From Swiss-Prot:
Residues 1-31, 80-117 are annotated as: Disordered. It comes from Bacillus cereus (strain Q1). Residues 1-16 have a biased composition (Polar residues). Residues 98-115 have a biased composition (Gly residues). Belongs to the UPF0229 family. InterPro entries: Spore_YhbH, UPF0229. This is UPF0229 protein BCQ_0617. Residues 21-31 have a biased composition (Basic and acidic residues).
Amino acid sequence: MGEENQPNYTISQENWSLHRKGYDDQQRHQEKVQEAIKNNLPDLVTEESIVMSNGKDVVKIPIRSLDEYKIRYNYDKNKHVGQGNGDSKVGDVVARDGSGGQKQKGPGKGQGAGDAAGEDYYEAEVSILELEQAFFKELELPNLKRKEMDENKIEHVEFNDIRKTGLWGNIDKKRTMISAYKRNAMRGKASFHPIHQEDLKFRTWNEVLKPDSKAVVLAMMDTSGSMGIWEKYMARSFFFWMTRFLRTKYETVDIEFIAHHTEAKVVPEEEFFSKGESGGTICSSVYKKALELIDNKYSPDRYNIYPFHFSDGDNLTSDNARCVKLVEELMKKCNMFGYGEVNQYNRHSTLMSAYKNIKDENFRYYILKQKADVFHAMKSFFKEESGEKMA
């Protein structure tokens, strides 16, 4: 063959699976991020970048159990062949830290100043939707009952019809295979193949109106001078996730925001989450305001009612008996009453000492001592009921 007839192309014999390496690594990294989010959820929900994000779609949060990529050296100088014991997986750490297994003093921990380098952590971009899906998975409004079934209805889509034509995304694979099998069997060869046009079955939806129950949540927060920056941040973190949970899972839930010190007032949502107050503390004022709202706007015959009150427990001692009486009056009209107390140092609480005598099963309380308790308080107040759900 002459030079003029030589082919002007070459056949590549490289391993094409290597071209997917970057994609596979990216998928593995995303799986690690999701696993880290799940394992660190109690700490992540109170990250300031999330609570102060005003509900932005994507936020950057530190995930301390997820390391940044780096080369690690094996300090063991012994000669060896291969690595591991045969059961290693892609991504496993095989290097040793050279400490000989001895526990060393960590940087920035314990008493006294340290001279070691700080601990690096990975800052991942996470969508609020991802956190919500992991967080709200097992939450629901407790004791939810039907109210005004004939008046309050919502649109609902149901796949309740089968047709021979439709969108390919709505094809009913099971019914299509059964139809093909029956047709082929009638012709003497029972088989799922071939599938003809006449065998195709598509699911079709209809919009129906379904009865739904109304509910209102009364978010009550102590904004007095005894509520410091940390206490207010914890309370607002809880109410931030509570409002997102309610608006994500329920279409017909109203939320009223009430702030109080010695006096209580209904405030806009933005002011509730941003404005500071001062002064003394008379908690009975906020319960009176809640009862006033119920009497004027939210009849128990029409609404499921859920009051939630957050405070540091530092209340005027002479007001405690009045608070207990008003809480008991509220519980007669409400499905559940929730009290959250931010008490980081386990100090004596005048309000909690009075509330511990309330024996009603619809009264729930939770003491928050650290940031992770916001997650646990949500789980405690909105835990799924073991019995039957609302029909």
